[in-house]
Amino acid sequence: MFSTFPSNYLGEQKNFFLFARNLINTMDMINTTPTESNLSGLNQKDFQKDINNKKTDLFILKNAQGMEVAVTNYGCAILSIMVPDKNGKYANVVLGHDSIEHVINSPEPFLNTTIGRYGNRIAKGKFTLYGEEHQLAINNGPNSLHGGPTGFHTRVWDAVQPEPSTVIFNYTSADGEEGFPGNLEVEMTYRLEDETNALVIEYRATTDKATIVNLTNHGFFNLAGIANPSPTVLNNIVTINADFYVPIDEVSIPTGEILKVEGTPMDFR
């Protein structure tokens, strides 16, 4: 399947497999050394840093079922998702980081972060809105990717944790930031559900000027659990109820065609 994607412009996947293997080796410590405060073994002091007069920190979410999620307000990055298997043994099902320095200096800068203002690629970093052309920051070959080089994944968000299962992040993106028009106020919530063990992500955004926005999370999952040695994702089963897909060109921009998935590596039905 991976051969169907051009590799030169997949900025967030460049050298990913080498990066993931090295990261998994460090995650053994995180996965198997729980502390009194959290199952992942993460140390709050390792995530406390002053960046441009704003403080980063570690936040632990817990629900009534014992599920636990660790996040930081730098890029709203998810650091671990600890879930029990059928025998009650906990495992982390996302790749993550064990310090704020690792988050900031990661060779995969989008790992588990909130993406904005606009997820995915914008061709040549340009778009026209109501007759006005806007030029965005270029960071992926000829294109703008995931909001630009200093998108939401690099920002320190304001944070409040109103209850153990919920954390709310806020960030105001100034008019013209990375080339996008309008002051954009964003609220992003992580919430653990008690009955379903679901991690719910909610986004809200308001603006004072016509603009575009496309928020998402760039999670890297391995539902077999992250450990050392780690199982691969090859035994994970993926189902996508789609009969068609959109092909991309040599710089990963949609060609405008809509093709059938039948008989292609894109068929996950």
Where are these regions (language model features)?
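An exposed, glycine/acidic-rich loop-and-rim segment of catalytic or binding clefts
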Residues: M29-R269
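Charged/polar low-complexity intrinsically disordered segments
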Residues: Q13-K14
